[in-house]
């Protein structure tokens, strides 16, 4: 439920409303916009205080049918969120390119990749130090050594670093080295992990699960924001369908739908959707045309 306050509402009036809701057992998030203050009431049973809230001084409108993900919805925050990573802004006027290898394999490989993507115009280096694999026998990443190599590549090139965190107990370690923490598609429903990254300040890149709906993705983002971290970037990376010609099916419709439903920035991963490098440029152009705020592209020096 969302309460829209009158533009003339005083600070004391706002404080009284927040105090009433908190004393009633709800979490409260206040968003200031040019249209006025939006007060999101987070928690089950909000309808029990609807009548009392509607009658309070300063409340202009009550929206009881607000989405079940109030903190990430446009209803809560009409203006688009810009996620800043020092001088890199995702969701602003610039199309931000993130690029790099799927996994950090060696010092030579990641430094060569960093040099190449920087020269091509990327602002963020991607690379996996911890890799969740479908097979337990596949390469799982270099771990802490991979994080150290990513940090060295950042020092050398000035690129920001995004890398995946796969377990709650690794969040602090990854946050020590990375500028952006990635939640991969396989972990989009890992709620303990989502809550853990929500309790640290680094931006979070949330990839859509391969069989997840747009609403399920927004619920996952809500976990992160509800934990206290509003710096979330959403990533469409393709979903699993009956089609077998490509690795996944890139859901371009998700980009404008997400832009309509949420204030969070949206980027697209054309590489994991395509599965073949010759198709990546076309999907990347299509993603930009659909309104994506950035691209995350797989690049390998070999």
Where are the predicted features?
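Non-catalytic terminal accessory/regulatory regions of metabolic enzymes
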Residues: 1-97
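Catalytic beta/alpha-barrel core
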Residues: 6, 142, 158-169, 179-191, ...
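Conserved, mostly hydrophobic/aromatic
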Residues: 53, 100, 125, 174, ...
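N-terminal small/glycine-rich loop or linker at the start of catalytic domains
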Residues: 84-102, 129-136, 259-268
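Catalytic alpha/beta core domains of metabolic enzymes, predominantly
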Residues: 85, 200-299
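Active-site mouth loops of central-metabolism enzymes
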Residues: 94-112, 135-141, 159-164, 185, ...
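Glycine-rich, proline-tolerant flexible connector loops at the mouths of alpha/beta enzymes
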Residues: 126-144, 300-302
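Alpha-helix-loop-beta-strand connector modules within alpha/beta enzyme cores
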Residues: 139-163, 196-203, 252-266
């Amino acid at each position: 439920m969302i309460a829209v306050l009158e533009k003339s509402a005083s600070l004391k009036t706002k404080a009284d409303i927040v105090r009433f809701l908190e004393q009633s057992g709800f979490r409260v998030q206040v968003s200031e916009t040019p249209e006025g203050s939006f007060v999101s009431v987070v928690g089950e049973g909000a309808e029990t205080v609807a009548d009392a809230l509607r009658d309070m001084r300063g409340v202009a409108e009550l929206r009881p049918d607000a989405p079940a993900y109030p903190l990430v919805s446009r209803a809560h925050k009409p203006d688009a969120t810009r996620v800043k990573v020092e001088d890199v802004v995702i969701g602003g006027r610039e199309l931000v390119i993130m690029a790099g290898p799927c996994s950090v394999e060696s010092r030579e490989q990641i430094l060569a990749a960093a040099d190449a993507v920087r020269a091509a115009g990327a602002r963020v280096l991607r690379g996996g130090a911890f890799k969740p694999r479908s097979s337990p026998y596949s390469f799982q990443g270099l771990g802490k050594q991979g994080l150290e190599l990513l940090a060295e590549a950042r020092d050398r090139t000035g690129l920001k670093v995004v890398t995946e965190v796969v377990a709650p107990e690794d969040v602090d370690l990854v946050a020590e080295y990375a500028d952006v923490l990635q939640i991969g598609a396989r972990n989009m429903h890992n709620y303990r992990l989502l809550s853990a990254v929500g309790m640290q300040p680094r931006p979070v890149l949330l990839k859509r699960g391969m069989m997840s709906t747009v609403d399920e993705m927004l619920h996952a983002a809500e976990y992160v924001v509800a934990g206290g971290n509003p710096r979330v970037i959403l990533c469409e990376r393709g979903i699993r369908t009956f089609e077998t010609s490509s690795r996944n099916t890139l859901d371009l419709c998700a980009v404008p739908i997400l832009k309509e439903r949420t204030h969070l920035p949206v980027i697209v991963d054309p590489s994991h959707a395509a599965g073949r490098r010759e198709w990546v440029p076309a999907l990347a152009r299509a993603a930009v045309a659909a309104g994506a705020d950035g691209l995350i592209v797989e690049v390998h020096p070999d």
